[in-house]
Amino acid sequence: MQLERAAFSDPFSFLGPQYQSKGIALRVWMPGAVSMVVEIENGEKFPLTREDESGFVLISKMDLTAAVYKLHISWPTGEQTIHDPYQFHGFMPSGDALVSPSKMHSEMGAQLISLNKGGQPISGVRFLTYAPNASAVSVIGEFNAWDGRRHPMQRLDDGLWGLFIPDLEDGTQYKFELKDSSGNSLPHKADPWGYSSEQYPSFTSIVYDQSRYQWQDKAWQTRPVSVKHQEALSFYELHAGSWRRNEQGDFLTYRELAEQLIPYLSEMGYTHLELMPVSEHPFYGSWGYQPIGLFSPTSRFGTPDDFKYFVDQCHLAGIGVVLDWVPAHFPSDDHGLANFDGTALFNDPDPRRGWHQDWKSYIYDYGRDHVRRFLISNALFWLEHYHIDGLRVDAVASMLYLDYSREHDQWIPNHDGGNQNYDAISLLRWMNEEVYSHYPNAMTIAEESTAFSGVSRPTDMGGLGFGFKWNMGWMHDSLSYIQEEPVHRKFHHNTITFPLIYAFSENYVLSLSHDEVVYGKGSLLDKMPGDEWQKSANLRTYMGYMYGQPGKKLNFMGAEIAQSAEWSHDGQLEWHWLEYPRHNGMKKLVSDLNHLYQDLPALHELDCSPEGFEWRVQDDAETSVLAHERFALNGDKVLVVSNFTPVPREGYTLGVPAEGEYEVLLNTDAEKYWGSGTPIQQTVKTQLLEKHGLAQSISLDLPPLSTVFLAFKQHA
């Protein structure tokens, strides 16, 4: 019997009240029950007759199709009263649940709803999933002893399966039990749209009420739409499990992070927190980049309400929250999307397109409609339900190119014979259009490591539509330069200046991310040449240079305290080093740089425009000195001068365009930053002496290994 094998796809045709020639037949399938009684609305009770080992029936003249009834069930271990799920026929959404990405996340999965039948409201959970190639799907959980025979789902249109189970509440654990097209049992699956989840070993999904949390960030959410390109954006990239641990070495919870991290971010002057992926992921060592529960914040650090509280508190402190989002691939764990209905439902079955060789994970099939809507719905979900301010899209290059990290015989060209993945390109454009149309104050950021054109260009101009792109070229070239011994830097001068050739081809974020301090690469401090003092001085110079360059800023946690060891997800940052001036000085410097960057429009308003930057000294390779000016929309300007050698440059002369004076705002060599404290003029007047093709010039005493910021004041 199909019910006995949990292989029935049309339970409403047999279970619940059914019309027949002798009246209404009420059938209930309840494996393990001893006896059963039905109670109708007026309180009358009627025993059901056992038809076979697990089935019960009542033949009645009463119309049970319109009224609500209860079942009183006797089990070997006790009594139970429930509303029969199979009396609620016709309460399922249509295939429209899969059509609109902005609505999908509120329709699919486990939704707490209240139905009205016969004038009586009945609360419970409506389960809805997508498995077009399955022959049967059941909901299993604690409520039915994880028995797939008890709650078979109804096959609906368009590949959907649904069932309303009354009386279930927030916090109910569940999974889906599926059979493939041949009737073979599949591994129990977590809900692809599940709002909450449990970690190893159960990997269960958990019913969660999205409306329960009471947000306090209305002022933040309703602030006027701003031009992000002209804002000071300074991101602190963070891995929640290894920023700080408690005294026992355990993770901080979301609420503990709110208490400890947010004041730190405010002190340090960061405008935004960028969280490495918080979507549920079974393998902690993946850092979140192998997600399975795309709609569920990881339970390692608390509940969904706890994560909402964390975001809420960030907003109340004036700090935006950006999430790393991973649409490039998904892991092969049995309880996830892999082989969900017995087929490659979410990935291309051909491994040349559907399997990532480096990461040993599946690649989404971006050409399939349900996959596209699933991913876009997920992007919108985080902005809607968790008030997230932006998405940093991971591994975009791997999506754009069919031959990404493949040999010539390991990929399939597109229909034009090329290597671009047109479906992925289309998906990213659609995602950006949806995000910016629904949430105009949000931002999307691409981690894209190639020269693909127009990543941050609007879609109506042929671009991908991202707000920003990480400048991987700047990161690579600048780190390559700063790792050279100072005496050799003159031979690599073009390496540090080259990124300015393309600095305005995209809306760039200058990123010093986690990727640069793992896998044997060492910490930023460890990359620097020289003795202990020179390492710190080089890093201070480099940080100053970064904050003076055009582009938004991103630092991975630990850079701001000159972490000496490379990052490990199994521990915490080296906070103990802050007892020493070398590290505490770096912390003070990064804080001052962030606040300077925010306070001076010249350092951020035209980050993405060539009108905001001019070289003053570009080609002095012999001394390894660079100088440029940054401009605000109102014409205010800041001069940034970097000396990349440990040799003080007394009376260094550089040309400037106008008469006036320059006032020192910040000097990375200052003693409070653990610098040498080499004397430097605090105010420098221009002189009528031509230099670098300009009529005016100034003479500066440049400290060794330093970056100096100076504000210009024009003479009346």
Curated annotation (Swiss-Prot):
Annotated SUPFAM superfamilies:
(Trans)glycosidases, E set domains, Glycosyl hydrolase domain
> Which keywords appear in this protein's UniProt record, sorted alphabetically?
Carbohydrate metabolism, Glycogen biosynthesis, Glycogen metabolism, Glycosyltransferase, Transferase
Citing just one GO molecular function, the answer is: 1,4-alpha-glucan branching enzyme activity
Q: Which domain of life is it from?
A: Bacteria
Entries under Pfam families matching the protein = Alpha-amylase, Alpha-amylase_C, CBM_48, GlgB_N
Q: What is its EC number?
A: 2.4.1.18
- What GO cellular component term, any one, is given? cytosol
GO biological process terms held by the UniProt record: glycogen biosynthetic process
SMART domains, from UniProt? Answer: Aamy
User: What is this protein called in UniProt?
Assistant: 1,4-alpha-glucan branching enzyme GlgB
Organism (species)? Photobacterium profundum (strain SS9)
